[in-house]
Regions:
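Extracellular/luminal ectodomains of secreted and membrane glycoproteins with large N-terminal domains
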Residues: 1-6
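Conserved eukaryotic protein kinase-like
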Residues: 7, 11-392
Length: 392
């Protein structure tokens, strides 16, 4: 009996020791592989960072004195008083108010250092450095120091357009009156016309939306955020693109479903039209919080009113001049959101239509106004860009 007990205890001790050794071995292996993975990620990060630095240096060399000023990170901290006054935040990072040594105010967009490989950052610096227009934001400088990246813009006292068109208001008063709304819409159109035709290299923005339109003290609009922009030669009409880019609600159909036509400057025209429709309505074109999309898709409702020559019933219209202004903005927008890119006007034509008389505008063809369901919007928001017959 005693020998049996001793034998059992001996076997138990061996099993316990084996289990402990096995556990220790697994922990050692896990630690080894963890170190390998961390070392690999670290190596990839520094390789990417080194490549970014090479691209930035090449960019500075190519542009010489035309390149924006480069600041080091300590200067960025000093101009923002150690990031004291935060203006906003998004997926890209945060924006802070700052002051340059000459006393002028700036908005400093500090990017998430470990996000991506720096392509969007370099893209934005390269794009805006090619521009000089009253309706395009001016880049005062940038910072690229290790994983610390920042873009420094001229400060816009009135912030972005979105806060003036979506915030709560009364049933009869708008935050921005119709003369200012028209001025903003025309200014954005002129800025896009410049990007498409006025630059040595054509710039396609691909993310036109109220959030990316900044307003100065006189409500003069400035197109901003060129992180998704694409540069191409002026003679090029169709550009190649891997994957969809833009924001749901403003993305042109051909970007999601390539069988509808090639991606070109007409994609910006579509985004512009959708944005102006939200400006005149003071609301989102699609309310993703409601499932009955037939009842909530604003462009459908507007087209029916125009087609039947009925009052648009838009908020804040005080006289016949404002009524004509509103109707003109709606007509132009409905031309811009045509499903077929070839049916959309160029931005030069948009400017011409906005500056012309209402009675000179032809009724636009009825576009295939597609309003996505809530589930489809949710799937698009997480990056699942799919094309089917139901949404073309």
């Amino acid at each position: 009996m005693f020998n049996l007990y001793s034998l059992i205890m001996h076997d138990f001790t061996l099993l316990s020791t084996g289990a402990v050794l096995c556990t220790v071995g697994l922990l050692v292996l896990l630690f080894f592989f963890r170190e390998k993975i961390l070392r690999y990620k670290c190596l990839r990060f520094w390789e990417s960072n080194a490549e970014d630095h090479q691209n930035i240096e090449a960019f500075l060399k190519n542009y010489g004195s035309y390149a924006p000023k480069r600041y080091n990170y300590s200067e960025v901290k000093r101009m923002t008083s150690c990031f004291k006054n935060k203006l906003g935040q998004g997926g890209y990072g945060s924006v802070y108010k700052g002051t340059l040594q000459n006393g002028s105010h700036v908005a400093v967009k500090v990017l998430n250092g470990l996000k991506g490989n720096g392509e969007e950052f370099i893209n934005e610096v390269a794009s805006i450095s090619r521009t000089s227009h009253v309706n395009v934001v001016s880049l005062e400088g940038f910072c690229f120091e290790g994983c610390k990246r920042a873009l420094i813009y001229k400060f816009m006292p009135n912030g972005s357009l979105e806060k003036f068109i979506y915030e709560e208001r009364s049933d009869s008063v708008r935050q921005l009156g119709w003369p200012i709304l028209y001025k903003v819409a025309l200014g954005i159109a002129r800025g896009l016309e410049y990007l498409h035709r006025g630059c040595t290299t054509r710039i396609l923005h691909f993310d036109i939306k109220p959030h990316n339109i900044l307003l100065d003290e006189d409500f003069c609009p400035k197109i901003s955020d060129f992180g998704l922009a694409k540069l191409c030669m002026k003679k090029e009409s169709i550009v190649s693109m891997l994957g969809a880019r833009g924001t749901i609600g403003y993305i042109a159909p051909e970007i999601v479903c390539r069988n509808l036509g090639g991606v070109s400057h007409k994609s910006d025209v579509y985004s512009y039209g959708m944005m102006v429709l939200e400006m005149v309505g003071g609301r989102k074109n699609v309310d993703v919080g409601v499932d009955r999309t037939s009842e909530i898709y604003f462009p459908h409702w507007l087209y029916q009113r125009i087609e039947l020559d009925e009052e648009l019933q838009l908020i804040g219209i005080m006289n016949e001049e404002e009524k004509e202004c509103a109707r003109k903005m709606v007509m132009v927008s409905l031309w811009c959101i045509q499903t077929d890119p070839s049916n959309r006007p160029s931005m030069s034509k948009v400017v011409e239509m906005l500056e012309g008389k209402l009675d000179s505008l032809q009724m636009p063809p009825k576009p295939y106004l597609y309003s996505p369901s809530r589930s489809e919007v949710d799937s698009l928001e997480v990056g699942s860009y799919q094309c089917s017959r139901s949404n073309v």
